[in-house]
Structure formats: structure tokens, C-alpha cells
Amino acid sequence: MDGLLIDSERLMWTESMRIAAKEQGHTMSDEFHHTFMGRNLNSVGDILRKEYGPEFDYDIFLKRCYEINDTILSKGIPLMKGAKQLLDYLKESGIYTCIGTTTHRRQTTALLTANKMLEDFDDIVCGDEVSIGKPNPEIYLKCLSKFKDVDKSEALVFEDGNAGAHAGIDSGMRLVLVPDLAYLDDEVRSKAYKIIPDLSKAIDFIKEENERTTSI
């Protein structure tokens, strides 16, 4: 969701984490932030404590991030290119949709509500609703389980982040990679079913896939 559908990774999380780290006397570079984008919050805590030392208070850091995010969100966060058109097409076509996001339910609901997108999805699975976050595939397998008549071979996972991309690959579903800010390793690039520059290219791709599968 963050950085794929909504430009919240760039405009919200990058800024809030930078400020929250600075308040504890640390500098967070964009390059360092990009290395853990999309990972579950427990993993992020481990990474930050290793980087900043045992005195780093991750609970305070995370609380401040949410406070800063709420302030930024109140001013509005734009959608990523092609996101609205894609969601409209999927709904009109009767194609099931489910968000699998590391972001917790409270912030997810706020983001989607602010952008009038909450009703665009059949279901949502958030980071605080799985036992193991990305890059573990649990979140995407839980998304798939919401639709009893859909096999994983029929499902597409759209991802912009490295951790989420690995989760998509390991889920057994087909990964559609939409690169944005996050570092993407050679494995996810080589194993991606499709790489598109932004979501404006997704509709044509899905139409082509439907034509291909129905002609087999």
C-alpha cells in the first residue's frame, strides 16, 4: 500500500522516521531507510537498535512516527500514478482485491479513508494481524484465503518493496514488481513475473493476462 497505491512512503514514513530518529540524537539517511522499507515493525526495531545502539528507545520512536504521520496525513497524501484508474477497473471487472500491508490497522484505515479508497477493496490484512510480517509470505497467503474460489496460480501480488517482493515470490503467487524508492535485489528482479514502471501500465497487463489465460 505505502509507496504502491499511496505516496505515503515518500511523503509520510520517510519524514516521520527521520524526525523521530533525530529527536533521539540520530541521523537517518534515505539510503538507510530504504534498506528496511516494507519490513514488519519488529524487524525494523531490531535493525534500528543494531544501528543506533541499545539505548535507542524504539517504542518512543514508533509512537512519534504515528503522531507525525497523523499530522502529515491531515494535510493529504496523493495517490501513486495510475492507482485510482486501476482500482476502478478491477472493481468494474469483478476482480477480487485485497491489501496486504505491513502498516497497522489504525494507520491503514486512516490512509484509505482520507483517500476515499476504503470501499475499493474486498478485504484488507494489516501488519498487526499476522504473526510473522514480510518478507515471510504469511500476509499474502492470508489475503488469498479470503477468496475460497481463487487458486494461488491465478493470483497476482503487486509490490514495490524488497521485503514484500520476497513475500510475494515465496507465497507461490505471481509477482508484479512496481519499483519506487526501495532497494530491490537481483533475486526479486529475476523472479518477478512482470516489472512495470507504475500502475498506469497495470490495466493493459491484466487485460493481456486475461486474454492469454482464456485462450489456453
Language-model segments: which ranges?
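Active-site neighborhood of HAD-like aspartate-dependent phosphohydrolases
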Residues: 1-34
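Conserved phosphate-coupling serine/threonine residues in phosphotransfer and NTP-handling enzymes
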Residues: 4, 101-103
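Hydrophobic/aromatic residues within well-ordered alpha-helical segments
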Residues: 12, 37-41, 61-69, 104
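Alpha-helical elements of Rossmann-like donor-binding domains used by nucleotide-donor carbohydrate transfer enzymes
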Residues: 14-15, 43, 47, 64, ...
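Helix-loop "lid/cap" segments that line or gate small-molecule binding pockets
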Residues: 17-22, 40-55, 111, 143-146
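Metal-dependent phosphoesterase signature
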Residues: 23, 27-28, 47-85, 93-95
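Short, flexible loop segments at the rims of nucleotide/cofactor-binding pockets, characterized by
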Residues: 74-78, 102, 172
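Asp-based, Mg2+/Mn2+-dependent phosphohydrolase catalytic module
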Residues: 88-91, 104-216
